Amino acid sequence: EYTYTKGLSYTLNTINNNHYLRVFPAVGIEYLINNSNTISIDYSGRIKRPNFQLLDPFRWYTSKYDYSEGNPFMKPSYIHNVSLSYMYNNSFYTKMYFTKTNKDFGKMVFLDSENIQNQVERAGNYFDISALGINIEYNFQLGYWLETNLTGDITYSSYISNQTSFKNVRGWGSDFSLDNSFFLSKRLTGFLYIEDDIPGYYNYRKAKNAFLLNLGLSYTNKNKTMIVSIKAEDLFKTSNPKYSYYSNGIKQKFNNYYDSQHLEITLIKKIGNIFNKAKPTFQSSNSEERNRL
């Protein structure tokens, strides 16, 4: 990829030039051991660009003490990923991976130097990130009544800051999920979904435990023309993320509130389309005689 940009600011009377030539290869080798076992090695180089909101320099006030602003001088991030994967019988999959991200970008919170009461959420390229982890996925079926998908990820990450406002941190992070479908009868199906984010480091933040539990039940009539389902999401209201990090030596704590707990009832009725029905064909009493002519 070759990119050349030129930015002209009439207000500041400045010109900013930026150009680069980058190659982003993707290489993979797959070896079929037998019909049930497959192993593969992959490498990929990628680029990640900030969206417009992160580049927008204008301030967005959420209160008289807090505002957010983008950074038009942000650079893209470059990602290198190496992985070793193994798959068994299309039901068990595991991958060991190493990911290196240079100049990762995002928004971080600072105390306003002009007024210490104010908090500023400012975008920038703050960290170089190295992550070593393992991902596991297992699908199995128990008889005719249960289908289960189990996934898990464990990662050890290192965050190297390029600004004095943030210290270098490193640590573990892991998450697991369990997705179950229970076939109680030919027309009645139950659902159970569990997701747990174990306390650890995620995107530089030190997060507390977040647990999600969803339950559901679905009924389909004999002719499959009607489906009635009921679903309860975030049953215990424990999925809200809570995390913290240090900015300029001051601990920033965040307790996000998302109204994710709800009950959903759905009715789907298939009525049909009378316009797609074939029109009847009428024949006269002497149609057979006419066809002989």
PLM segments and residue spans:
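Transmembrane beta-strands of outer-membrane beta-barrel pores
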Residues: 1-6, 43-49, 58-59, 90, ...
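Outer membrane beta-barrel strand-and-loop segments of large Gram-negative receptors
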Residues: 75, 94-151, 158-175
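Outer-membrane beta-barrel signature, preferentially recognizing the C-terminal barrel domain
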Residues: 47-102, 119-132, 141, 258-261
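C-terminal beta-signal and adjacent terminal beta-strands/loops
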Residues: 221-293
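Repeated loop/turn-to-beta-strand initiation elements of outer-membrane beta-barrel proteins
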Residues: 36-39, 90-96, 144-148, 186-192, ...
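Residues on the lipid-exposed face of transmembrane beta-strands in outer-membrane beta-barrel proteins
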Residues: 27-31, 82-88, 134-140, 154, ...
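Surface-exposed extracellular loop regions of Gram-negative outer-membrane beta-barrel proteins
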Residues: 1-13, 20-26, 145-156, 175-199
